[in-house]
């Protein structure tokens, strides 16, 4: 193999990586955030979970943070796989910007929906609801 062929292959690999990164940076960032929050101690996860009483007393961040923490490894893995499947299914049709907007609206919608319409749910964590919101967005828009 000549030097020119090696350089050509390296350029193609760099282009492929740049294209991958351009399309996947947001999804990968979300998945890394979820993995990192799994390492948090239980008392911190409790501070981030959606619990009605603290939200009623002003801890509104819980409406969003609750969806990025999980009950353990299995719960995290299931949500990561679900998010990956949905993201991969529509990768060619949706930009990272559109994914960011869809996830933002889904997270806020799920948090407010549980808080306002499901007061019987005492404690909520996980990204499942937002994944369904993103899937719905992709099916409507894509």
Feature roles, as predicted:
Residues 1-61:
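N-terminal signal-anchor transmembrane helix
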Residues 19-22, 67-73, 117, 121:
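Membrane-interfacial loop-to-transmembrane-helix junctions in polytopic alpha-helical membrane proteins
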Residues 47-49, 67-74, 93-101:
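Short, amphipathic, aromatic/basic-enriched membrane-interface segments that mark the entry/exit
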Residues 55-66, 110-116:
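Short, hydrophobic/aliphatic alpha-helical segments
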Residues 140-142:
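Metallo-beta-lactamase
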